[in-house]
Each structure stands twice: as C-alpha cells, then as structure tokens.
C-alpha cells in the first residue's frame, strides 16, 4: 500500500520540489496587499515552508506596486520584531535589489544552512512613500536531517565487478519510507542494466560505459501541517557511478636500449600508461626483484599533464645496469606491472657534415649519416656551438673540449632527423667565428661527434660578394654581344 501511495504522490511531490509558484497566484493572495512571497517547496494555502535541516533556503519578497518604496522600507523581520539585514549573521541575512524584468523592489531572505532552531514566523514588511504599511508572514518548519543508509554520493568498483546503490533511509520505527529510484534525468532505471530489489539497485558486472550513469534516490515524507493536511517533503540524493580500471600499458613488455662506453651517459627507462582510472598516483621500479630507491644514481620522474607515465633515469649507466626492470603503476584502487628489458646497443656513427652556406646571422649545414646498417634508426641531430674565443679559453684543442665544458658554455639545440639533412642555425653574430659540434642520436643515446669551425659574414665579406656579382654582369653582357655577332 505504501509503494502504491508513493507512486501516486511522486509526480505531485516532484512538481512541488522543483518549482516555485508566486504567492500572488495562490487562492489566498490578497489583491490589496502588494507583498508577494515565494519560495521552493512552499505551501501557498498556509504560507508554510517545510525543509530539511542543513539545506540552503531562499525566500523572496517582492513589493508588486507602482507606488514608490525606498529600499530601507522593505524589510524582513523575525518573530521577536528584530530586523534581518545584510549584516544580521553569516547564516541568516537579507539582500535588497530590483526584481528582474521590472522596477519592483525585492528583498531575499537567505539561510546558508537552516537549523531546527530557525523554525518560526518570518514577516516581510513594506512602507510606501505615502505612509501605507503592508506585511505578510510565512511559517518556516525545519525537519530533522534525513539519514541515508549510505551517505556516499560517489560509488565505484573495478571494471567487471558488481556495484550496488542503496537508496534506503533510516526512518522512524514502524514508518515505511516512500522511495523512488531514477536516473539523473528523472526517468526509471534501465532494467537491462540494473537489477532492482527493494531500495537497492545493482549492476552485476561494471563496464566502462557505466561510468556516465547517475542514480537519483528520492524520498517522500508526508508532513502534517497545522491545518491537519499532509504536505509532501521531498529529499533527493544523486549517486554518481565510477568505474575503476587497472593501469593499462600499450604492451606488457618492451625492449629499451642504452650505450655503454667511456662517456658518462644516462639511460632512460620509460613506463608509459595508456589508460587508468583513477589516474596512477604511485610508480615503483624494480631491477630484478630489488626495489630501486632514489639516489645519486637513480631518479624517478612522473609525467605532469594529460599523459600518464613515469621514467627511471640511471646516471652513468654501466654493464651492471643491464637486464630486466619492472614498473609498478598504482592508482590506489588497483596496480599493474610493465616489464622492460634494458639492452646494450652501438652508438650512432659520427655524421658527415658539410657547410652549405654562411650568411650574416646564420649558417646552413648538411648533416648526413654514413652508417648504412645501424643497430637503431637515427631520431635526432644534436648541434652545439660556442664562440671561438670561448673555445680557446678552455685551454685545449677544439676536439678535446670536454662534455662538461660544452654543456656549460655552448648553445644547444636538438633537431629531428630531416630527409634532406639541411639545418639552418640562426641568431649568430655577424663576422664571428664559432666552433661547432655535431652528433647523431638514436634510442640508445648519442654517437661520436664531429667538431668544425665556421664564420659568419662581416661587412667586408658582403662587399666582396656584391663586387663579384657586379663584375659578372659586364662579362655576361660582352659574351652575349660576341655571340650575337656570329649569328
């Protein structure tokens, strides 16, 4: 019987819950009284507002008259006669403004969170410029907060696992609560997805597409007003579904490479996650069965931004660092593993570098690979340059300048491999000589370098080029004239 009554009252209750009807539209409205009070969930027959403790509440009072009224003459008052203004207290205050779409004065009574102590009478009073006084009183009834069996508004489970939404409430003893369960749009739950038993709805096996679902738990309590009539009080709790997944990788295992020689090199081991919900929070790397701790040799960097993943940086890699690594990705709800095999590969061969053209503020180079059968394909070219004077200050020949000196004194750029091998380096000072270092890079690391010197053009060089160009024109003209004589 209770369920049947709930279904009959549900449309009426929802209508009252979501709409606010102007008191001037109610049968009890006094046409001579320009004060119109409105609020959600208000019974306009008795001018009573019934709400749950802890909720926000706003009550509007509009002075619907063409007569002038000063904003200080439209007031909300408590039952004891105290005015309620914008500074009454943080949880109860009023705001005065003009009604949208008209010039009528409006004062809004705001409860940031109603309490049972707020139960009582509230009066809106207005005094016109001509001295006429009007008022209208409402009764506020604050019911104890509803207690749900499950207070969570977000429920989640792993992909493939079951999930149950409990819409039950802890009602008074012997009183059966009236409960409806709908989707987020107010429609009945899809029985092809949900299994409904009592006040619980269950999905037997979560799928990724279920992450968009919402269950609205709606309770209807019939509250008896002073007039002995029952007024429906509607409460609603939306529960959003989350589908947790294992962190996923593009493949279960991968092979990565490094170069081991007399250079100080860093090896990078990547652990890229293609999908995880929630996002991965912790990454742990293992070499064999031993967990890797942060140190001067090992450092773990986590991606920041949209892409999920991390990488392990191994400083000054050597033969002992080769072997099998394991990356553990943990998103708090679940964890998964990716295996990486770190292997040794040959460094790229030194490139063939040709000066194509020197200009006033740039130099054009052609960088080609001479290795026809590399272990790994070339991915980039590293180009560094420094002024000749800076190179000479190192105290050694250009070829013997250390990596550390290059890193601290040179301008660095890394360009992706181009089919034509042409690279123009801009931003140079005119008439200056530079020392250049070129080396190719593959997945394993960098190769042997080529060191060259090249100079940008100065004003004298440009004048010489212009003169040479000018001298070629008369010669070409004379040649043309000579040819014409024999035609």
Swiss-Prot record:
It is found in: Cell projection, Axon; Synapse; Cell membrane. Disulfide bonds join 61-124, 271-327. One of its GO terms (cellular component) is plasma membrane. Residues 1-23 form the signal peptide. Keywords: Cell membrane, Cell projection, Disulfide bond, Glycoprotein, GPI-anchor, Immunoglobulin domain, Lipoprotein, Membrane, Repeat, Signal, Synapse. It is a lipid-anchor; GPI-anchor. Expressed in the cholinergic motor neurons AS, VA and DA in the ventral nerve cord and in the mechanosensory ALM neurons in the midbody. Disruption phenotype: RNAi-mediated knockdown results in hypersensitivity to the acetylcholinesterase inhibitor aldicarb, indicating increased cholinergic transmission in mutant animals. A lipid is attached at residue 466 (GPI-anchor amidated aspartate). Cell surface protein which plays a role in the plasticity of cholinergic synapses at neuromuscular junctions and in the polarity of the mechanosensory neuron ALM, possibly by antagonizing Wnt signaling. This is Neuronal immunoglobulin domain-containing protein rig-3.
């Amino acid at each position: 019987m209770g369920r049947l009554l709930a279904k009959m009252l549900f449309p009426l209750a929802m209508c009252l819950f979501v709409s606010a009807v102007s008191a001037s539209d109610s049968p009890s409205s006094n046409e001579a009284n320009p004060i119109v009070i409105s609020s959600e969930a208000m019974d306009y027959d008795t001018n009573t507002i019934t709400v749950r403790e802890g909720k926000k509440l706003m009550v509007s009072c509009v002075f619907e008259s063409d007569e002038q009224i000063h904003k200080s003459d439209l007031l909300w008052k408590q039952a004891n006669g105290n005015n309620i203004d914008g500074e009454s207290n943080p949880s109860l205050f009023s705001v005065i403004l003009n009604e949208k779409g008209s010039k009528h004065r409006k004062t809004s009574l705001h409860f940031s969170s109603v309490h049972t102590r707020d139960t009582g009478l509230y009066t809106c009073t207005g005094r016109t410029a001509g001295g006429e006084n009007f008022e209208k009183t409402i009764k506020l009834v604050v019911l104890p907060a509803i207690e749900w069996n499950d207070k969570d508004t977000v429920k989640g489970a792993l992909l493939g696992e079951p999930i149950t939404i409990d819409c039950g409430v802890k009602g008074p003893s012997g009183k059966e609560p009236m409960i409806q369960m709908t989707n987020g749009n107010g429609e009945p739950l899809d029985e092809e997805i949900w299994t409904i038993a009592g006040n619980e709805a269950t999905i037997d096996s979560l799928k990724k597409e279920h992450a968009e679902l919402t269950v609205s738990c709606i309770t209807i309590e019939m509250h008896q007003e002073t007039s002995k009539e029952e007024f429906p009080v509607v409460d609603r709790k939306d529960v959003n579904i989350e589908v947790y997944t294992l962190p996923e990788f593009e493949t279960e295992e991968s092979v990565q490479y490094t170069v081991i020689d007399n250079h100080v090199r860093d090896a990078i081991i990547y652990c890229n996650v293609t999908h995880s919900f929630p996002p991965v929070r912790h990454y742990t790397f293992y070499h064999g069965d031993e967990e890797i701790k942060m140190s001067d040799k090992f450092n773990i960097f986590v991606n920041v931004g949209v892409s999920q993943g991390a990488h392990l940086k191994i400083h000054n890699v050597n033969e002992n660092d080769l072997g099998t690594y394991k990356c553990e990705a943990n998103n708090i709800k679940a964890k998964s593993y990716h295996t990486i095999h770190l292997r040794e590969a040959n460094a790229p061969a030194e490139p063939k570098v040709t000066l194509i053209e020197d200009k006033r503020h740039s130099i054009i180079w052609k960088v080609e690979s001479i290795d026809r059968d590399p272990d790994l394909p070339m991915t980039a070219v590293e180009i560094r340059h420094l002024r000749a004077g800076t190179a000479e200050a190192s105290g050694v020949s250009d070829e013997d300048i250390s990596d550390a000196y290059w890193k601290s004194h040179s301008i660095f750029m890394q360009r992706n491999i181009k089919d034509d091998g042409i690279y123009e380096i801009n931003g140079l000072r005119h008439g200056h000589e530079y020392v250049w270092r070129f080396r190719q890079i593959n997945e394993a690391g960098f190769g042997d370098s080529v060191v060259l010197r090249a100079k940008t053009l100065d004003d004298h060089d440009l004048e010489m080029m212009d003169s040479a160009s000018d001298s070629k024109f008369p010669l070409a003209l004379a040649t043309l004239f000579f040819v014409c004589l024999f035609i």
